[in-house]
Design a protein with these regions (language model features):
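Non-heme Fe(II)-dependent double-stranded beta-helix
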Residues: 1-15, 22-149, 260-262
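A structural signal for short, well-ordered beta-strand segments and their strand-loop junctions
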Residues: 20-21, 118-122, 177-180, 216
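Aromatic-acidic/polar surface patches that form glycan- and anion
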Residues: 26, 94-101, 157, 201, ...
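Short, solvent-exposed loop/turn segments at secondary-structure junctions
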Residues: 26-27, 125-130, 143, 171-173, ...
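Non-heme Fe(II)/2-oxoglutarate
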Residues: 43, 51-54, 69, 190-194, ...
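A structural signal for well-ordered alpha-helical segments within the folded catalytic domains
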Residues: 103-107, 162, 210, 215
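Catalytic core of non-heme Fe(II) oxygenases with the double-stranded beta-helix
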Residues: 107-108, 132-206, 247-254
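A structural signal for short, well-ordered beta-strand segments
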Residues: 122-125, 164-166, 237-241
Length: 266
């Protein structure tokens, strides 16, 4: 059964910039992704072993099995090159793509976008392990969608994009949760440097998702995530969807976007 958003859900999404839906997937379903995430981590370690551990090298990318492994900095818990994210994670582990195409997820995206169709741009695994040092500064996703360049057009005037996060693990205040700044997106796209400076020291609201729960957010809400200082991993499956006509940038695995019927089973 597909989740039907209420008028208050829609208002919350556009006023606060994000929406939390609890228990969208079962723990058994996300356990499959947890096992896949550990296989991906093992692959990442093999690839990282061939890379020099260089704090100043910037991002380095390697393709394997239809996925792109992105490395950068040093994993302080291992002393080796750190895996930042896996792009198009469903290439080497299909359970990630199955999650991103599941109608329980995409139907909510469709209700938020007000559209039965979209193009999928992102299918990623982000994982933080205890004391690996990985954190993300305050930012808007509109920066990464290339807002203000010919590669992006806000066709509906409300962002034209929804990003989804499915928690693979229970999120705690200690293990590096997403932190949102409600209402921060009402002004639309902001200067990235200003966002980092203005929001770096603000507390924000942590999204303490239980495994199987999901966050949905637009491209303008400011958010960040802290370092994992807990004892357990914090792994999330990310999928991003744009309205047709919004994006012209090419993404690994998706090109300019894979067409998706949002209300139909994949």
């Amino acid at each position: 059964m597909l989740y039907q958003l209420s008028p208050s859900d829609l208002r919350r999404f556009y006023d606060d910039g994000y929406l939390i839906i609890e228990d969208l997937f079962s723990r058994e379903e996300v356990e499959e992704m947890a096992e896949a995430a550990e296989r991906i981590r093992a692959l990442g370690r093999e690839i990282a072993a061939a890379l020099p551990a260089d704090e100043e090298a910037g991002e380095r990318k390697a393709e394997h099995g239809g996925s792109q492994f992105v490395f950068g900095g040093i994993d302080r818990s291992l002393g080796s090159t750190r895996l930042l994210r896996v792009v198009w994670a469903g290439g080497c582990e299909p359970s990630f793509l199955a999650c991103g195409r599941d109608a329980r997820l995409t139907a909510i995206v469709g209700q938020l976008l007000g559209s039965s169709t979209a193009v999928q741009l992102l299918n990623q695994l982000h994982a933080k392990y205890p004391n690996d040092g990985l954190e993300f500064e305050p930012h808007q996703d509109s920066e990464h969608r290339r807002y203000g360049t010919p590669e992006w057009c806000d066709v509906d005037g409300r962002g034209s994009y929804v990003q989804t996060v499915v928690a693979i693990d229970d999120t705690t205040p200690e293990n590096g949760p997403l932190i949102f700044f409600p209402g921060s997106g009402r002004q639309g796209h902001l200067d990235p440097a200003t966002v980092r400076n203005d929001y770096r020291d603000r507390p924000g609201i942590p999204a303490l998702l239980e495994a199987g729960s999901a966050a949905f957010f637009g491209p303008y809400v400011v958010h960040r995530s802290a370092e994992n200082r807990g004892a357990a991993p914090r792994r999330i499956a990310i999928n991003g969807f744009a309205l047709p006509g919004a994006n012209s940038r090419s993404y690994f695995g998706a090109g300019t976007g894979v067409p998706v019927e949002l209300f139909q089973p994949s």
